[in-house]
């Protein structure tokens, strides 16, 4: 077998349908849209259900968006193990390490085990995270 002898497997390639190019093309006259009616004419907008009350209006409105909500990037204790012993961990260093996407507000949670003595600076800490960091000989600082 040579490169010029390679052919695509049967049924894997289709030529595009040239719609509305004469009756003998098989896609002429009504172009696969059937006879008359709404669907044979222009477009029907997304979500339109033919006059029936659409789903997005049948479902009740719920809740609201709290404008004072603060989003925190979450970091767990096992993620802090990648820093050197005695290092100072800040939101900027967490971003450089790839643990958070933005160096904004960070909350440290207590999942996993911390094996190193670190000084951790973050916006918030869970009680278990503070206990684990201090048990490892480190310090926590709310910024």
Curated annotation (Swiss-Prot):
<dbReference type="GO" id="GO:0006412">
    <property type="term" value="P:translation"/>
</dbReference>
<dbReference type="InterPro" id="IPR005749">
    <property type="entry name" value="Ribosomal_uL15_bac-type"/>
</dbReference>
<keyword id="KW-0694">RNA-binding</keyword>
<keyword id="KW-0689">Ribosomal protein</keyword>
<keyword id="KW-0687">Ribonucleoprotein</keyword>
<comment type="subunit">
    <text>Part of the 50S ribosomal subunit.</text>
</comment>
<dbReference type="InterPro" id="IPR030878">
    <property type="entry name" value="Ribosomal_uL15"/>
</dbReference>
<dbReference type="Pfam" id="PF00828">
    <property type="entry name" value="Ribosomal_L27A"/>
</dbReference>
<dbReference type="GO" id="GO:0022625">
    <property type="term" value="C:cytosolic large ribosomal subunit"/>
</dbReference>
<feature type="compositionally biased region" description="Gly residues">
    <location>
        <begin position="23"/>
        <end position="35"/>
    </location>
</feature>
<dbReference type="GO" id="GO:0019843">
    <property type="term" value="F:rRNA binding"/>
</dbReference>
<feature type="region of interest" description="Disordered">
    <location>
        <begin position="1"/>
        <end position="47"/>
    </location>
</feature>
<keyword id="KW-0699">rRNA-binding</keyword>
<dbReference type="InterPro" id="IPR036227">
    <property type="entry name" value="Ribosomal_uL15/eL18_sf"/>
</dbReference>
<protein>
    <recommendedName>
        <fullName>Large ribosomal subunit protein uL15</fullName>
    </recommendedName>
</protein>
<dbReference type="InterPro" id="IPR021131">
    <property type="entry name" value="Ribosomal_uL15/eL18"/>
</dbReference>
<comment type="function">
    <text>Binds to the 23S rRNA.</text>
</comment>
<dbReference type="InterPro" id="IPR001196">
    <property type="entry name" value="Ribosomal_uL15_CS"/>
</dbReference>
<dbReference type="GO" id="GO:0003735">
    <property type="term" value="F:structural constituent of ribosome"/>
</dbReference>
<comment type="similarity">
    <text>Belongs to the universal ribosomal protein uL15 family.</text>
</comment>
């Amino acid at each position: 077998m040579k490169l010029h002898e390679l052919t695509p497997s049967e049924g894997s390639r289709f030529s595009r349908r040239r719609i509305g190019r004469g009756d003998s093309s098989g896609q002429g006259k009504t172009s696969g849209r059937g006879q008359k009616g709404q669907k044979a004419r222009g477009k029907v907008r997304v979500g339109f259900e033919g006059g029936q009350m659409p789903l997005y209006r049948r479902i009740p409105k719920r809740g609201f968006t709290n404008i004072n909500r603060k989003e925190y990037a979450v970091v767990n204790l096992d993620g802090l193990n990648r820093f050197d012993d005695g290092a100072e961990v800040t939101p900027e260093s967490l971003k450089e390490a790839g643990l958070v996407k933005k160096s904004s507000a960070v909350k440290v949670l207590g999942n996993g085990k911390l094996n190193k003595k670190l000084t951790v600076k973050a916006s918030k800490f869970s009680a278990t995270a503070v206990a684990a960091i201090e048990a490892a000989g480190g310090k926590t600082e709310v910024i």
